[in-house]
Amino acid sequence: MLETNKKYVLNQIKNSDVSNQPWIHLIVKNFLPKDLYDGVKQETEQYTRSEVLEKTNIRAFHIYVNESVNVFPPTPYLKEYYNILLDSDIVNVIKSKLSIEQNHKDFYSELNLFTRGYVYDEIHPDRSDKLITMLHYLADDGDDESLGTMLYPPDKDGTKMDVFKDCVKSAPYISNAVCLFAPKDTKEFKTNHCMANRSDKTFLRKSFQTFWIKEKADWTKDKQSGRVRL
């Protein structure tokens, strides 16, 4: 089954078009086969149903993978999901789409949850130690599609932009959609983006935040201030 599901994901990536606006990124809809996606989503429910998420203005997270320190999920659907993401064919087709030549040396992924009212600290390009960033949206039917990752002009400093007024595009927050990009942070060019939940329609925004990392790193010990670890 792993091989069949891997081929499906590979084809979904291959058949999705890269966008250059406002900077290079790749949106892949229906990223996983339905059975695998449904299983993965079900295995996150012990965290998405946490009592702390009944409050507004909360950001919570649960770490599923940090490859170099041997952190992996114990459940079958999530295991298969991450085996697919770590498969060299999958990694190589993503790199090809995003024009990346460097190889990753580590891999990290967490479940990331925002309740209504939460706005990320600031518009940011992502740290330069990240080779590839992937956001995988776990939206429910009827959720607010505007809750996807917001994208901003690459030639401006994020601290000088408004999270809502200066957004030029947002990835669609729809079930099983993915946004992929290669972080860049130079004086002239920044992959500026941000996340927030100011929706009147959707109380809980759910996604995986996944990173292929340039060097080995233990991110399980990072103290993420202002965020609840589940």
Task: Please identify what each model-predicted range represents.
Residues 37-40, 120-123, 193:
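A short acidic (Asp/Glu
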Residues 4-8, 13-97:
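Non-heme Fe(II)/2-oxoglutarate
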Residues 113, 123-129, 140-141, 145-230:
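Catalytic core of Fe(II)/2-oxoglutarate
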